[in-house]
Amino acid sequence: MSDLFSIVRKNDNPSGRIIWSEDQIAFIINEYNNHHSTTKIANKFNVSRESIRNVLRKNNCKVLSLEELGKINYPRNSDYFQEINSPDKAYWLGFLYADGYIGKTGEIRINLADKDEDHLRKFLAAIDASHSSIKHSVKKIDKKIFNQSYISIRDKKLVKDLADKGCVNNKSLILTFPTDKVPCHLYSHFIRGYFDGDGSINFFKPTKARKPNYRISFYGTEDMLKHIRAILNKDNLALEKRNNIYSLTIMGNKQLESILSFIYKDSYDEIELTRKRQIYTNFLLQRIGGEPTQVGCE
């Protein structure tokens, strides 16, 4: 395979014209037809992107501009969110409610930390778009560097159906709980998706305590959190408001056991964030006995 990527130039001149072998040309065409970018192919040969584009043009391949690439519709299940009638659809709707960017031009974008990149693959698999590429970027906040993974998909049908379910552009201050869009028996999956996207679970150990105490928090609009609070049977807890964002925090290992058992009810790997699931598993390992009380809808 190493010989495949070895470049031969005319007269062995480092700046001379590249003499491509038939195998190299076939490889380039095959990679491009399988939706690999010209930049990615060029990096394999250590040549410029334009060199790859020239090979494609000379072999009658249509080379798309960056604008055209952004608009291309690769095969996917565009009807995925048409009806929320399964655990996976409820989960991903909740996740996009919390952590998805929905553009006016038909774009869905999800940004996650690099450590959660596998979660993007789970979403792509859910909508039958595993061929779509995951991109990477670096974000700087308060002099701290964050490495991110993200996907960007353009699909007007997906975006329209999401909008019909209340997941809209600039949603952070106007989201309402989709009581008429998500069946009651799927609430746990929707809330888990929302929790994975815009919630936290962590622990702290008081000085005299033998075991760590856990707490979970949800963040969002007042309407969203009031509905989540009611479903979790925690109407006695107050919401906190800071910079137009509300939060709901629940502490105490005993009550968290019942809440987390509801959130993770009938969950499985494809519809849960692995990192948070591991924290929940550690929490269960530290609990001793006791049956969790019932929360959620009957």
Feature roles, as predicted:
Residues 2-298:
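Internal intein/HINT superfamily modules and their associated LAGLIDADG
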